[in-house]
Each structure stands twice: as structure tokens, then as C-alpha cells.
């Protein structure tokens, strides 16, 4: 085994670090493939969701900054995954009577969301429901705010699903879609390969706007962050 000393060139240290990074990336790819990002399953799915709780933090917080939060609101997070977005929303709502509901059609995702938010579920501030965006098990006009973060890519029928979202949103309520990639010139080869590999629905800003309008949303606003591939789209019921 070769030991690295403080006298070795800095370039050698950087090479070693890059090698470790490459191994980590390969491991993450394996976990993602086995875990199935479209519908997380098994232990690899749980590992992937916990990683996504961290990796989605920046884009989520950037997008949530555009929203106003009411401490008495009832919010829904569609495709709640590992549950971190639910917690971020409740934190921004602050003390009060507000409730955040998470929905996901993956059993593993629901388990992870419940695990992460067990204290808030016990307190009555959260609940998690296993269901699909295509058939949300809620009455019309149930929510003041609805979000979906890094989930829209996998919706089988985007237009009908958005209409279902609008159905359960209260009049004048807000819906926000958040994604860390949108269709544009200059996307990296790795991003393009992932879009193809995982069969992701990735739209241009104008296509998102048109889709929201077709689903019946008004006051549609599209935000993109310069220097990134991030996008968030807001619509009002």
C-alpha cells in the first residue's frame, strides 16, 4: 500500500481526490439505477432518497423563496420522496395551525417521508399518503399551496395531472413546480444522457407556461436561475 506524505506534489493529492470522487459518482449511479428514481424501491431506493434530501436542498430553497407562506395554510407536496421538502415548507410556515401533506406513489418514499418527519406527524402538523398525482385522494379545493420538486419528470400524463392538481387547489391558491433542469441549448452531454436514460419529461420555459395555461392556471410565472439549469413555475388556481 502506497502512503502519501506531505512532501508529495499537490497534483498527486488532487489526482487521488479525483479518483475518490469518481468512485463515489459510480456508486451513486449504481444506487440510482437500482433504486429507480421514477418509483423508488428497496434499500437502494431509500439510500437514493436520503441523498436527494440533501442534493435537492439548494434548488428547493431557491424556489421556495418566491412563495409567501401562511402559518395557517394547508399545503400539499406531490412526489414527496424523502420528505425534506415537506419539512422545509413547514419551517417556512412557522408556528401556527398549518398542515403539510405529502403524497407519493412509492411505498419506500412514503416510508422515508414518515421516518424523517415522525415528530411532526405525531404532532399533527404533517401526514403522508400513498397515491398518484393522476388520482389525488382529496376533495376539490383542499389546499392553499401545492408544490412538486424534481417529480414532474416522471408524470405519465402531464396535462391531465396538472388539471388534477388544480382540482384540489383552493381558488387563488398557488402551485409551484420545481426542477433542476429545463430544455435549452447547451445542456451537458451527461444531462442529455440522463434525460434519455430515465425517460424524463423536460420542457422549455415556454412549454411549461403553455402547459400551465392549458391546465387552467392563471398568473403563470416562470423563473430560471442564471448560471444553472434550474427552473420553477408558479400558477394560480
Briefly describe each language-model feature range.
Residues 134-145:
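A short acidic, Gly/Pro-enriched loop at the edge of an enzyme's catalytic core
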Residues 25-53, 174-234:
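C-terminal alpha-helical "lid/dimerization" subdomain adjacent to the S-adenosyl-L-methionine
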Residues 2-30:
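N-terminal auxiliary segments of SAM/dcSAM-dependent transferases
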Residues 74-135:
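Class I SAM-dependent methyltransferase SAM/SAH-binding core
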